[in-house]
Amino acid sequence: MKESDFMPVSNTLGRAFEYALCQKIDSKFDNITLTDRAVAEQSKDKRYYDALNSDEKSKYDISTNRICSEWLNLKLISSNMYTLDRLPDSAGVNGDVTDIRLEAPNAIVNISLKHNHNALKHPRLTRVPKWIDINTDSKYASDYKNIWDSFLSKANTLSSTATLFNELIAIEANFVFDNLYNPLCKLVSNYLTENIKTSSQVESLFKFMVGKYDFYKIIDNPDCVLIQDFIDLKMPKNVKIEQTDKSYIKMTFNNGVILNLRLHTASSRISTKSVKFDVRGSFDDIDSITIKKN
């Protein structure tokens, strides 16, 4: 949930939800103390909650109240004293998907929050080698740059005045898919297939995409709250990676997990050269509970 002067609506709602849940936890449980970092994040994100209308605030109150009373109170040990921390976006770069961490000397509850979506994460393409424990790869970096250079050259030929991706799409519907998404997906798919040589690399890729540490994913949907248990997941030893469409990559792990990565622009402006994957997963052995709001 990254802060920006031009933060998308989905991000502001996500920050407001994280703020609301932390406030509810703090008020409901006497054995929890916020860390200095959490206090600072709460202070920053209060404005997003305050910007909600009364109906939205009421919905958040219902969701957070149900999470605390019907789930979290069963996970916390009443005799423990916990700290509540809010983790920065930088943790996700290294595979920790935790947004809220409740920690005691002998217990820990990691929570990943999602508001009206179930994406696992949104990784950028510049760090692909690091996904499989390769610190740097000059050839990958060069190939990535060449794809962008070629795309920008073709875009300038198509329209020398276009500054937005949508302007290119308006002229030629499949232009971005054919000249940017497809070659980038091919690059990533081929690179991972050719460079994953050990089971430890498969495990690193899995942990990066799904989560490095045990956690619970809480998805706040309009009619219910879905809580998924990502505790003690079996680690995979093998993975099959394939490009399934111009903007899609599929990862099939031998522990029953299938990940689908959809490539899309992270900014509307061509000059930012910013793209990222939206990662969704299918899991065979994930326990989950659904808490109805009505």
Which sequence ranges carry the predicted segments?
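Short, positively charged
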Residues: 1-98, 103-294
